[in-house]
Amino acid sequence: MTKVYITDTLSKSKVPLETLEPGVVKMYVCGPTVYNYIHIGNARPMVVFDALRRFLEFVGYRVIMVQNFTDIDDKIINEAKEWNVDWKTVADTFIAEYFHDAQLLGVRAANYHPRTTDFVKDIVEAIETMIKKDFAYPAENGDVYFSVRKLRDYGKLSGKNLDDLRAGARVDVNELKKDPLDFVLWKSAKPGEPTWDSPWCNGRPGWHIECSVMSQKLLGDMFDIHGGGEDLIFPHHEDEIAQSEALTGKPPAKYWMHNGMIIVRGDKMSKSLGNTFMVREAVRRYTKDGVKLFLLSKHYRSPMEFSDEILQDNMRAAQRVHNALNRFTEKYPYPLVPKIDEEMENFIDRFVEALSDDFNTPVALSILFDTVKELNKSMDEGNDERALKMYHLVKRIYGPVLGVFDSEIQKQQQVNSEQLDQLIQGIINLRNEYRKNKQFEIADKLRDALLNAKIKLLDTPEGTKYEIND
């Protein structure tokens, strides 16, 4: 089996992937808190770990993947109050919307998508075990806290020192805690909030405990890879390790992989900062493959700058690939499978080598683009036999592994998307001219005409942008 190397956040080094069970990779990836539509920042781990899963399957592993939904949280409760609906309606709605957006991106469903609320009984039992082992304690009001100082090596994932954390901690007004660093395992109920029974009080689980319990129940006491965004390293993943070690005496995962953040004008893309760009809007404007090329164009551990210009570049790159594939299938609508020769093996070996080296998708994509050039060159030279080989590499090997270029429908979608963008940009430029000449009435009519077509103009310091609403 191909030797695969990954960067492990815990050991802070690139290490060979040596699975606990030969030939099987068990992987847990933290999913979203379902209180809104997912944005491009949420989509990066979805696309990255879906592609990693595809690659591991390609080189011969059986992959068992779990990705959870946090379906009870303050944000969900607040959203429900704002819209005067039940909290479960909010969670159910945005779980369905998540799968809709995942389908738009061509991200496969995990083997399991557990919800926190389906594991409350197991969570309560886990907390009881930690209390018995003296790793947790109930407070006077029924809250239950994890005693961080019971673990001497707390902070090993993030590289944080307990004493430094203590010194840098803000004054904690929560007098129920024995130590300001202790984190909540069980929250006592507030009026009007959903609650579950427990030995301590009616309440609900804390955030960190859910992943420890769900991963253990579905993948066992220890599994191979735990993935997620680097913003989860501390405190979420650090606390997961603490809980799992308290419960089982060992960390939940052998390896930890974390993707970098999407950056918008210097800040992390997040709903709290109001700088998000929703997945469905991105796919509509830049196409599925344009968005996925963008998300795979940088090494997964590196931060990525988000901008309209960068997405446009990736959309055009995707269009060039589709043009080459469609050029071949217009001549040969039903391409056969070629015999793998030495040249093809060399291409495949380079592609696998790139992804085996800490999942280096930028290098893998450069090999894909080189192959597309060779496809066009072979077509130009009338060498259809070689063109078939290059087509096969792009369409049937590289594409399925990375999760791109898997739909013939994409051709028309991409053409339409680019043409629509050019049309709207032309109208925006015309409107700007009218505004410059103080012909505001005509400028407003152009804006209103677009709005009637569900295209909303947004005048920003960086210029006029637009969004398309359903």
From Swiss-Prot:
Co-factor binding details: Binds 1 zinc ion per subunit.
Catalytic activity: tRNA(Cys) + L-cysteine + ATP = L-cysteinyl-tRNA(Cys) + AMP + diphosphate
Any one GO cellular component localisation term in the record: cytosol
Keywords for the protein's UniProt record, in alphabetical order: Aminoacyl-tRNA synthetase, ATP-binding, Cytoplasm, Ligase, Metal-binding, Nucleotide-binding, Protein biosynthesis, Zinc
Motif 'HIGH' region: where in chain: 32-42
Enzyme superclass (EC): ligase
A biological-process GO annotation: cysteinyl-tRNA aminoacylation
Motif ('KMSKS' region): 268-272
CC cofactor: Zn(2+)
E.C. numbers: 6.1.1.16
Coiled coil: none
Localization of this protein: Cytoplasm
SMART domains to which the protein is assigned, alphabetical: DALR_2
Binding, Zn(2+): C30, C211, H236, E240
Residues that coordinate or bind ATP: K271
Keyword Translocase listed: no
GO MF terms held by the record: ATP binding; cysteine-tRNA ligase activity; zinc ion binding
Xref: InterPro entries: Cys-tRNA-ligase (IPR015803), Cys-tRNA-synt_Ia_DALR (IPR015273), Cys-tRNA/MSH_ligase (IPR024909), Rossmann-like_a/b/a_fold (IPR014729), tRNA-synt_1_cat_dom (IPR032678), tRNAsynth_Ia_anticodon-bd (IPR009080)
PANTHER family named in the record: CYSTEINE--TRNA LIGASE, CYTOPLASMIC (PTHR10890:SF3), CYSTEINYL-TRNA SYNTHETASE (PTHR10890)
Quaternary structure and partners: Monomer.
Family stated for the protein in its record: Belongs to the class-I aminoacyl-tRNA synthetase family.
Name of this chain's protein: Cysteine--tRNA ligase
UniProt organism field: Fervidobacterium nodosum (strain ATCC 35602 / DSM 5306 / Rt17-B1)
